[in-house]
Amino acid sequence: MNNYQLTINEVIDIINTNTEINKLVAKKENLFPTDLYDLDKQELIAIILNSDFALSSIKRVLLEVTVEELGTQDNDEDDELEDLDGEIDRVDYIDKDGIRFDVPRETSPHVDKSIVTFNDELLDEANKIAKSIQEHDFNDKAIEEAELKIFKNHLPSIYSMKKENK
């Protein structure tokens, strides 16, 4: 099974192409949709991970990519016929253990978070950071880890600022 890595721009594209997510995120954060591009990485991760609706839509996009890659997605002609018959449109979903599920397309089955990364970081790890920030669980170890990650993310920009000031 492949590892699916989402870049910030891919996540923003998912948000921007889904008007419901876009409205939800923009309304919650009092932002215009284009402001999402200006957010700090940690802020964007926290917004997305704390929005069940955004997460389920991202999971659905990942699932559709997985299904397309495996070649098991129904083609559009069949979809139209199934819809006319009143049958529920179904797709095959294969989990990490190779077990095949036949699930309705409208649902979003569980996507194994262990295969999904966000900026080369496991989704579970990013989720822990967002939850600790949200719950104000500021113990010393969590603060050190967060500061180290933020420092590593901003190191290139600090270096370029020093060069400009010389």
From Swiss-Prot:
Induction: Expressed in the early phase of the viral replicative cycle. The C2 promoter controls protein p17 transcription and is strongly inhibited by the viral histone-like protein p6, probably because of the formation of a p6-DNA nucleoprotein complex at the right end of the viral genome. Thus, protein p17 is synthesized very early after infection, and its synthesis declines later on due to the inhibition of the C2 promoter by protein p6. InterPro entries: Phage_Gp17. GO terms for biological process: DNA replication; viral DNA genome replication. It comes from the Viruses. Keywords: DNA replication, Early protein, Viral DNA replication. Homodimer. Interacts with the histone-like protein p6; this interaction optimizes the binding of protein p6 at the viral DNA ends, thus favoring the initiation of replication. Belongs to the phi29likevirus protein p56 family. Involved in the replication of viral DNA. It is required at the very beginning of the virus amplification, conditions in which a low number of viral DNA molecules enter the host cell, possibly to recruit the limiting amount of initiation factors at the replication origins. Once the infection process is established and the other replication proteins reach optimal concentration, it becomes dispensable. Optimizes the binding of protein p6 at the viral DNA ends, thus favoring the initiation of replication. This is DNA replication protein 17.
